[in-house]
Amino acid sequence: MYVDLAQLEQDELCVEHEYAVGELDLEDAEIVLCAPPRVRFRLQRLGMEIRIEGRIETEIEVRCDRCLSAFRLPVRPDFDVFYAPIEVLKPEEEVELTERDLRFGFYQGERIDIDALVREQIRLALPFRLLCREDCRGLCPHCGADLNHEACRCASQEWDARWAALWDLKRRMEGV
């Protein structure tokens, strides 16, 4: 979906859009859309800059970082970004970025790619660690059992002789 900036004759334009199933590709095999994203946003012309603020609502399916089970995650990020024409970029100049500059995007011509913005905001809304639940116990590193659903199938404790000196030290310290 593109927004034609010629439609922005007034200084503001409000848009509501619900993507059709399969219309938006997240370009990431690890993230599957379960519900078509709904986007509501407002565009404002601020001189040469365009401000877009709004909200996205969708649900995605991802894999847990601990147990690798697929689970659904609601995603509802609010966003507030600025766009400027790419022509204002002067690559030969050295510029110190401010916090506001980190929320800047660039457009070419007279339209802005909203699909790219939606993809970016969905990815940014993901938590650093994707967990199916807070107390996920993960997989056994030896036998691979999902500890959320079954007990570990490997021996209770395998002795590794390389740790013998530390075990002796621990016993001596506990005995003191």
Label for each model-derived stretch:
Residues 1-176:
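Structured interface patches
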